[in-house]
Amino acid sequence: MVDMESPLCPLSPLEAEDLESPLSEYFLQEMGTIQDISRSLGEDSSGSFGFPEYQYLGSGPGSDGSVITDTLSPASSPSSVSYPEVPCGVDEPPSSALNIECRICGDKASGYHYGVHACEGCKGFFRRTIRLKLVYDKCDRSCKIQKKNRNKCQYCRFHKCLSVGMSHNAIRFGRMPRSEKAKLKAEVLTCDRDSEGAETADLKSLAKRIYEAYLKNFHMNKVKARIILAGKTSSHPLFVIHDMETLCTAEKTLMAKVVSDGIRDKEAEVRIFHCCQCVSVETVTNLTEFAKAIPGFASLDLNDQVTLLKYGVYEAIFTMLSSTMNKDGMLVAYGHGFITREFLKNLRKPFCDMMEPKFNFAMKFNALELDDSDISLFVAAIICCGDRPGLLNIDHIEKMQEAIVHVLKLHLQSNHPDDTFLFPKLLQKLADLRQLVTEHAQLVQVIKTESDAALHPLLQEIYRDMY
């Protein structure tokens, strides 16, 4: 069994330049509301829907704040019926609490006019038509009345007014009848439930697609790695690489295909660096296939796809690499071997600096106790990052990113209900990853300069103009 203990390390702060990341905006929003979380958990979030009261504020009768009836009301109705004014906020929320649409054209309703919710434009149109007894040219096209075209066909507009229930017999302004209020409240609640249900289904579908693509494209996931590291596999025990002798043995057995004749005679550090490159190239290929499975990615401009992968693959690689690590070392050779952290630290300069920062990051990241479903969404969010330099269709990419981050947030809340701050803590890791990749790219350039280690063409293309 390999020791699995992972010490809890303090979170590192966000760097100033990382605050420009759209993902980091979520972090700032989360941190801004953390103070309210404990209070909000105890509040009744069900609430109740209230509706505004509309008053006639013109001159003459009713200018004192009372509400008058339509001057076209039947003779049997009183000429001036007053309704008591209900102070806003006493038993109903402000008028802005619910955005009600005009039943005729869909514009924002200004009140309850002639028996229905209507905007000022349609209210005035109906009043003029009735008062002046206007007759419009007949239209058989059943025109669709919308805000942008409501003035084009007056016949169909007036017909729509009548069809939705506008009547000169109804009061012109005033409080919404209780029956209408109850009906509208029921409609709003039903609509909200339906839309929430549809949205939840869409989000679950997105999360499922990303998770399935993750499991399909990556051989070593966290579940497998943790089982191997815990020594719970029924196969042969891990071969531990802890010195030069065991390294040579592993190169002849576990890594024989990777360590070719061309590099077999080079120094140990260069051979290890070569093996790391081979793993990286394979993972980049798998990440490319994973990215294609993210809804919307394959439809992006090819240049944008390349840019997102170029800047995101190493952040994703170091994220997934954490699953194979514990405080003592990491899995190699598809989980058949284990190389100790101490052995890697004792390599000569600058090779000894290659893996230690990754171990430090992994200890903090593993302390979050994410599972593969969480990690899959986080990796997808890393790839679809709208602040990468040189992107063409930024708006579309940011919408993709926003959807994935929203799914990630909801998934974490469901998967880790007891960890209220997990989402902002995870987003903070974005800053750590960017710094980690920057330092790694700089170290690779040093290794290229100070040794005879060659860089794989694919990785060379990724590093070019990167930092």
From Swiss-Prot:
Post-translational modifications: Ubiquitinated by E3 ubiquitin-protein ligase HUWE1; leading to proteasomal degradation. Phosphorylated.
CDD domains the UniProt entry points to: NR_DBD_Ppar, NR_LBD_PPAR
Region Required for heterodimerization with RXRA, residue ranges: 304-433
Organism of this sequence: Cavia porcellus (Guinea pig)
CC per GO annotation: nucleus
Subunit structure: Heterodimer; with RXRA. This heterodimerization is required for DNA binding and transactivation activity. Interacts with NCOA3 coactivator. Interacts with CITED2; the interaction stimulates its transcriptional activity. Also interacts with PPARBP in vitro. Interacts with AKAP13, LPIN1, PRDM16 and coactivator NCOA6. Interacts with ASXL1 and ASXL2. Interacts with PER2. Interacts with SIRT1; the interaction seems to be modulated by NAD(+) levels. Interacts with CRY1 and CRY2.
GO molecular function terms noted in the UniProt entry: DNA-binding transcription activator activity, RNA polymerase II-specific; DNA-binding transcription repressor activity, RNA polymerase II-specific; lipid binding; nuclear receptor activity; nuclear steroid receptor activity; RNA polymerase II cis-regulatory region sequence-specific DNA binding; RNA polymerase II-specific DNA-binding transcription factor binding; ubiquitin conjugating enzyme binding
Site (Essential for heterodimerization with RXRA) location in chain: L433
Transmembrane regions: none
Residues annotated as domain NR LBD: 239-466
Listed name of the protein: Peroxisome proliferator-activated receptor alpha
Coiled coil start-end: none
Main location: nucleus
Pfam families according to UniProt: Hormone_recep, zf-C4
Family, per entry: Belongs to the nuclear hormone receptor family. NR1 subfamily.
Function: Ligand-activated transcription factor. Key regulator of lipid metabolism. Activated by the endogenous ligand 1-palmitoyl-2-oleoyl-sn-glycerol-3-phosphocholine (16:0/18:1-GPC). Activated by oleylethanolamide, a naturally occurring lipid that regulates satiety. Receptor for peroxisome proliferators such as hypolipidemic drugs and fatty acids. Regulates the peroxisomal beta-oxidation pathway of fatty acids. Functions as a transcription activator for the ACOX1 and P450 genes. Transactivation activity requires heterodimerization with RXRA and is antagonized by NR2C2.
DNA-binding region in chain numbering: 99-173
Locations listed in the record: Nucleus
SUPFAM superfamilies named among the record's database cross-references: Glucocorticoid receptor-like (DNA-binding domain) (SSF57716), Nuclear receptor ligand-binding domain (SSF48508)
One Gene Ontology biological process: negative regulation of reactive oxygen species biosynthetic process
Key word S-adenosyl-L-methionine present: no
Zinc finger (NR C4-type): 102-122, 139-161
Keyword terms, alphabetized: Activator, Biological rhythms, DNA-binding, Lipid-binding, Metal-binding, Nucleus, Receptor, Transcription, Transcription regulation, Ubl conjugation, Zinc, Zinc-finger
Domain of life of the source: Eukaryota
PROSITE patterns: NR_LBD, NUCLEAR_REC_DBD_1, NUCLEAR_REC_DBD_2
InterPro entries from the UniProt entry: 1Cnucl_rcpt (IPR003074), NHR-like_dom_sf (IPR035500), Nucl_hrmn_rcpt_lig-bd (IPR000536), Nuclear_hormone_rcpt_NR1 (IPR050234), Nuclear_hrmn_rcpt (IPR001723), PPAR-alpha (IPR003076), Znf_hrmn_rcpt (IPR001628), Znf_NHR/GATA (IPR013088)
